[in-house]
C-alpha cells in the first residue's frame, strides 16, 4: 500500500510539472538514432591509465565497446570518429561497490489473517535471499543519469529489502537498449536491521536468525547429498530460502554485510568467523576504532562516499552565545573532523577500500571525496577506491578499473585534473557509448559569503517536465549570517499553488543549496536543491529521494527584495 501511494504521489508531481526528466544531462545522441559507427578515437588527451600513474598525452582507440589501443602513435582505422581530446583529462570509469541507483523496492507482502508475530514467514520477516536486484533495476531512472554524470560506469546494484534482502548484481550504466547486466548473483545482501513488530526485531535476534538460516541451509545441503546417493532416506525439505543460500555456504558468493559503526563491524566479523562465509563489509560510517581489526582480518571494505553535514560548524558565532553553546559547537567540529579523516587513516593503515554510494546524493559525491582528500586521504588512494580497488573487491579487474588494451571502454573525460576545484566531467564513456554533459565556467569561492551574486529576494523559477514547463517563486531573506525562505509550486492535488518553507539554506562561492518538503498523495517527499548562481540567474538540479535529479532554473526579480 505504501509503495502504491508513493508511486501515485510521484505521478501527481510529474503531471503537475513539478519534476522532470533530467534534461540537463544532454546525452551524445538526443535524437535516439543509432550511431553510425562504434569506433572512436579520442586523440591527444592527458591519460591517467591507473592510480599512481603520471598523466601522459595519448590517443585511445575504442571499437565495439572495447579499448583497442592506448598510445601516441596509433594507426587509426578510416571508420573511426575522431574526438579531439587536447584539453581533456581521461581516467578509468568509476566503479560503485554497492549502489541502489535505479532500484525500486518491491511491495511488502500482505500479512495473513492468522499472522503470528513470533513466527512470521521468511518473506514477511525480510528474509528473501531468492530476490534479485536485477528484477528491481531500471536503466531509465534519473538516478542512473545522475550517477553516470558523476563518472560512475559500473556498479554493483543491491536489492531493497530486509535483513537478507537478496542477490546483488553487476551492471554497467550504458545504453538503455541493452540489458547492461555483467553478472547476476555477485553477493548476498544482508544487514542487522530487525523486522518491525515481529521476530527478529532486535540486532541480537537478527544475528540469531541469520545463524539459524545459515546452519539449516548447511543441513539441507548435506541431507540433499545423502538423499541423492542412498535409498531409504527421508527426503529433505528444500525451501526457497535454503535453495538461495546454497551459493553462500558453498563459498561461491560473499555476503555483502551492511554495517554502520565499529560495534556492527565486530558483530558481522563474529558471524563470519563462526560460520565461515566470505565477507564484504559495506556502508561503513564510523570505523576509526576498528581499523586495526579490519587490517588484521583482511576483510574487504566499502566505506560511505559521504561526509557529515558541516553547516553547523560553519555557522558564525553570535555575540550572545553561551559557553555551553560554544562547547557544543567545538564537540560537533571535533566529531566532524574525526569523521572526514577516517578514510586517510584507513589508507595509512594499508587497508585497501572502495566506496558505496547508498545514502549519498549523486551531486555531492565528488564534493565528499574532495573533503576526505583535504582531511588526509591521498589523491592516489581516492582514485584507487573509485577504480582499481573497487575492481579487485568485485572481482572485475580483468576487464575494468584501468585504461588498457582489451578492457571495457569505460572512461571519464574531465576538463581538468579530476580532483581540482573547477574540474568538470564533460564526457563519460560506458561500454563504448559516449555520453556528453554540459560544462560551465565556475567562479572561485571568495570567502564564506557567496560571490555569485546576492540571493536575497524573490526568484521566478521553472522546471521542464514531460507535461511542459511549470514553476513558481522562491523567496529568500537574509537575517544576519543566516537565510530563511519559502517556495511555491503547483499543488499535486490540483488545488492551485502550494507553499513550503526552505530548510538548510547555504550559499558559498556561487553555490546555493536548500531543501524543502512536498506533500502529495498522503506522502511527504523531501526535495534537495543545488544550483550555481551567476548574477541574477541560477541553474541547477533538485533531487527527490530515490527518484533522482531533475533540472531547475531561476531568475531573480530585483524589484522584490527580501532582506530583513
Language model segments and positions:
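Bacterial Sec-dependent N-terminal signal peptides
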Residues: 1-30
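Active-site core of metal-dependent hydrolases
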Residues: 158, 231-338, 353-356, 392-394, ...
